[in-house]
């Protein structure tokens, strides 16, 4: 029996011998690669020493060959995009270290500087997102809502249902930047049950309206006659200590809107929000009515010297406010009667909030008193500031009627 001849001419060696030689060559290449890697590791960033470590002598400084011919210092190997290390000096002073990546974020600049090993500008931090402005009309609105006051309200549950509301009743939209920085001011005394309903209904509404808002409950201390307008002035000044609000909504604690298209924000003219209350048969009681819930921008509020401080007891202050706006050439804007519907929590009149017998006389003299009675004559003392999960409560002493 004959063996077959080899497929290739020349050597009669078995095919395994060629494979063995290839393996030896591969091992040699790997060893060379490992050696070069070790040299780089020992040399660190000082690449000037690399030729000496591998046994290569650099050309003379005057030579026109090698590195000098392409404009690099002699004896230096330079990687693309890497700046050269500083020259070695015969000095006992320590060399200054090259800036690290941490330095680049601590002292941001236009791009990589000398000595940097970055080939491009550092990547910005991903913790800050570039958000666009919220739309003029929120896409989250649902329209008409059923408002009921015959269910018990647990504020712990309300807190759980509004996890994005921060301590003190602050909320900022997460997916856009709201131009409406709204402080909602509630004049208050002994209305805790009403406040529960207000917080239960209004927090979801205000979030759907994509407002950057805070809730401030201004609590009148003591047992003297209630003064709604003065408490609103206090709320204006105290809220501005927290944040740069540009809009102020002044709301009674017992009024709830029935349509979330009735936005709690400011417009080019002062805004009357509670235009169709169930108390008045869902209609406006009279054209000059400005009570319940209203909104004024910071500039509008300052231009009328705020609200009057001398209306102790019930009634009159909202008509005085309307007169102030008219005397400053402003007109009141309102939503239509369908969107502007509101429900009021029924209750008996509070003690120390009886009708003010002087209200009609004071309303008749608004033009003479508005320059001296308002923000520029406001006096009060803050007794306590309490930051609750759903609102900020500021208890104040506003004095007694003079």
Swiss-Prot record:
Tissue specificity annotation: Detected in milk (at protein level).
CDD domains: b4GalT
Cytoplasmic side: 1-24
Disulfide bonds: 134-176, 247-266
Chain segments annotated as transmembrane: 25-44
PTM comment: The soluble form derives from the membrane forms by proteolytic processing.
Keywords associated with the record: Cell membrane, Cell projection, Disulfide bond, Glycoprotein, Glycosyltransferase, Golgi apparatus, Lipid metabolism, Manganese, Membrane, Metal-binding, Secreted, Signal-anchor, Transferase, Transmembrane, Transmembrane helix
Annotated UDP-alpha-D-galactose binding sites: 187-191, 226-228, 253-254, 314, 347-349
Reactions listed under catalytic activity: D-glucose + UDP-alpha-D-galactose = lactose + UDP + H(+); an N-acetyl-beta-D-glucosaminyl derivative + UDP-alpha-D-galactose = a beta-D-galactosyl-(1->4)-N-acetyl-beta-D-glucosaminyl derivative + UDP + H(+); N-acetyl-D-glucosamine + UDP-alpha-D-galactose = beta-D-galactosyl-(1->4)-N-acetyl-D-glucosamine + UDP + H(+); a beta-D-GlcNAc-(1->3)-beta-D-Gal-(1->4)-beta-D-Glc-(1<->1)-Cer(d18:1(4E)) + UDP-alpha-D-galactose = a neolactoside nLc4Cer(d18:1(4E)) + UDP + H(+)
Cofactors (names): Mn(2+)
Keyword Disulfide bond: yes
Record field: compositional bias (Polar residues): 116-130
Chain coiled-coil ranges: none
Gene Ontology CC annotations of this record: basolateral plasma membrane; brush border membrane; desmosome; external side of plasma membrane; extracellular space; filopodium; Golgi apparatus; Golgi cisterna membrane
Positions bearing carbohydrate: 90, 117
Stated consequence of mutating residue 314 to A: Reduces galactosyltransferase activity, lactose synthase activity and substrate binding by 99%
EC numbers: 2.4.1.-, 2.4.1.38, 2.4.1.22, 2.4.1.90
Region Disordered: start-end pairs: 77-130
The keyword Membrane is assigned to this record: yes
Chain residues that bind Mn(2+): 254, 347
Molecular function in Gene Ontology: alpha-tubulin binding; beta-N-acetylglucosaminylglycopeptide beta-1,4-galactosyltransferase activity; beta-tubulin binding; identical protein binding; lactose synthase activity; manganese ion binding; N-acetyllactosamine synthase activity; UDP-galactosyltransferase activity
Family indicated by similarity: Belongs to the glycosyltransferase 7 family.
Subunit structure: Homodimer; and heterodimer with alpha-lactalbumin to form lactose synthase. Interacts (via N-terminal cytoplasmic domain) with UBE2Q1 (via N-terminus); the interaction is direct.
Name by which UniProt lists this protein: Beta-1,4-galactosyltransferase 1
